């Protein structure tokens, strides 16, 4: 459940791996608004960081939010010993904050099972592409991804997309 939630949240919010791993479930989740806050913290013991010392908010769908609430409820005992949403659930390091290496290992195992090569950053690209299909403005996608420049966002959406070229022209006109 933890891994599915992590993947769902990354695909749905466009958050970077470090941003997801840095979520403190007691401070960063607004249960009334179904949002997750991204905060830059130097103190994260798993070295997870929000890039560019930024702060922003990501909205979760009803489905993912319900999954999140169930995950917290099902894992309350192990989460009580940690402020992090995502922790190691087994082994000698049980209860410690999940780190990037663990996520890469999990995705590698998933890739072997499914024959689909996956990487955390691909989920950010997926987020950007899906939001574009939904008609999001280029600047809104840029903001959601935490990009400073719209040119970076454009790279996430592919270079030969005519709709993207039109959107870029509109953005700069």
Predicted regions and their residues:
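Conserved catalytic core of the tyrosine transesterase superfamily
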Residues: 1-173
């Amino acid at each position: 459940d933890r891994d599915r939630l992590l993947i769902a949240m990354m695909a749905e919010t466009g958050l970077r791996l470090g941003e997801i791993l840095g979520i403190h479930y007691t401070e960063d989740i607004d249960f009334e608004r179904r949002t997750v806050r991204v905060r830059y913290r130097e103190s994260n013991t798993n070295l997870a960081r929000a890039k560019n010392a930024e702060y922003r908010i990501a909205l979760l769908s009803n489905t993912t939010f319900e999954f999140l609430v169930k995950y917290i409820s099902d894992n309350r005992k192990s989460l009580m010993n940690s402020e992090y949403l995502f922790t190691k659930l087994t082994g000698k390091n049980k209860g410690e904050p999940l780190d990037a290496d663990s996520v890469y290992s999990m995705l590698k195992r998933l890739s072997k099972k499914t024959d689909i090569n996956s990487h955390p950053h691909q989920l950010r690209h997926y987020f950007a592409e899906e939001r574009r299909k939904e008609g999001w403005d280029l600047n809104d996608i840029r903001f959601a991804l935490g990009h400073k420049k719209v040119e970076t966002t454009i790279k996430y959406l592919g270079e030969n997309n005519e709709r993207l070229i039109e959107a870029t022209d509109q953005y700069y006109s």
